[in-house]
């Protein structure tokens, strides 16, 4: 039979009438900020954060232009702490998610003071990027009252064209990074809510091998910005509902729980040396 789940806040008084409809009264309780993780709250907040990252992905897919993003779903979305550490991600592309934290941290290092309404673009493989076609958009989330940087949202999408010596920007015989396409180290696309699309177009058109599909690049980057902004909006709503202290506390609990699970997984692997051989299309072994 179909099954649904209903979340009822801890302090809410509930009762059911003769038609089995729930009546709700009272004011929801705000979880306390403390150093002890509550397993129930941990699960609830983990799913709250994950749902925000997933909604970012839905926004990106629906607003993107290219087949690569809209249909192949070659993108990833995640939420980060104010220092660039990964909190939670949607179940997207693992190779993106494993490196995005380094990208966010490099942006923070380049721009010590990120202003509200700013948005940054990068695809630098030496700074957490996968390869040049994977373009990352980083958006800060500031506290509405203090203006303090409290979170960051980020999305990474594979652009089917970013320049280079061959269409598709994945040449197998490139001799340097320039032959693979346009390098974007750290470009401020939006400053205080004002977009610099002209500067982005100029950047994508620079160099001996510029992008062949600048309009598609700009459209998909706009979709990534929209995805990040949806995450910003939902995170602010979460803070308004539970308070910043509680949200930060639950983020810390999630990170500690993840670290503990990883330690337990590593302990479960017996000591020893492990070898694995895989093969290329022509049968050449990779050891």
Language-model region placement:
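A short, hydrophobic, proline-anchored segment that marks a local hinge/packing element in signaling
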Residues: 136-144, 154
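Short, basic/aromatic recognition patches
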Residues: 48-72, 108-112, 121-129
């Amino acid at each position: 039979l179909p099954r649904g789940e209903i979340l009822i806040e801890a302090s809410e008084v509930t009762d059911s009438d003769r038609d089995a409809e729930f009546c709700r009264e009272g004011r929801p309780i705000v979880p306390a900020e403390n150093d002890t993780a509550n397993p129930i709250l941990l699960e609830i907040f983990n799913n709250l954060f994950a749902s925000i990252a997933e909604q970012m992905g839905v926004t990106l897919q629906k607003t993107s232009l290219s087949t690569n993003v809209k249909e192949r779903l070659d993108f990833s979305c995640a939420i980060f702490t104010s220092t660039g550490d990964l909190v939670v991600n949607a179940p997207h592309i693992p190779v993106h998610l494993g490196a995005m934290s380094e990208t966010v941290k490099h942006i923070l290092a380049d721009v010590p003071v990120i202003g509200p309404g700013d948005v940054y673009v990068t695809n630098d493989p030496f700074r957490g990027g996968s390869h040049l076609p994977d373009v990352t958009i980083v958006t800060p989330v500031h506290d509405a009252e203090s203006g303090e940087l409290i979170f960051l949202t980020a999305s990474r999408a594979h652009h089917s064209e970013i320049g280079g010596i061959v269409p598709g920007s994945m040449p197998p015989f490139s001799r340097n990074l320039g032959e693979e396409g346009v390098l974007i180290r750290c470009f401020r696309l939006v400053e205080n809510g004002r977009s610099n699309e002209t500067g982005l177009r100029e950047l994508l058109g620079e160099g001996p091998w510029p992008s062949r599909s600048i309009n598609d690049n700009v459209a998909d980057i706009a979709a990534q910005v929209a995805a990040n902004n949806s995450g910003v909006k939902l995170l602010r709503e979460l803070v308004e509902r539970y308070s910043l202290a509680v949200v930060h506390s639950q983020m810390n609990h999630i990170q500690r729980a993840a670290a503990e699970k990883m330690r337990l997984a590593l302990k479960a692997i017996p000591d020893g040396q492990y070898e694995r051989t895989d093969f290329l299309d022509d049968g050449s072994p990779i050891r």
